[in-house]
Amino acid sequence: MARITVEDCLEVVNNRFELVMMASKRARQLANGVPPLIENTNSEDKPTVMALREIAARKINSKMIDEIEKAERERAEREAMEWAAAEVVADEDMSKSDD
């Protein structure tokens, strides 16, 4: 696959700062297991390269990245609450069995 360039991405994104922010957030998502939106024909591509490819291909935008980030954050918070609730129930069960 051809190399991806900043210029390719700047045709999609207004400025370099926004591009860096989008690419870094998306690369982090990809590294954490969010599936890519384009086929990874070169399995050696790192998350940063995949993020830039998605941006250049117009498969992702900042709104989508923010929505994915929000969903991941909400999922993590929900899991933390479930773990905390399970610990409370376990503690209550332990204190009842001690009586």
UniProtKB/Swiss-Prot annotation:
GO terms for molecular function: DNA binding; DNA-directed RNA polymerase activity. Its EC number is 2.7.7.6. Keywords: DNA-directed RNA polymerase, Nucleotidyltransferase, Transcription, Transferase. GO terms for biological process: DNA-templated transcription. Gene3D superfamilies: 3.90.940.10. GO terms for cellular component: DNA-directed RNA polymerase complex. The keyword Coiled coil does not apply. The RNAP catalytic core consists of 2 alpha, 1 beta, 1 beta' and 1 omega subunit. When a sigma factor is associated with the core the holoenzyme is formed, which can initiate transcription. Promotes RNA polymerase assembly. Latches the N- and C-terminal regions of the beta' subunit thereby facilitating its interaction with the beta and alpha subunits. This is DNA-directed RNA polymerase subunit omega. It comes from Xylella fastidiosa (strain Temecula1 / ATCC 700964).
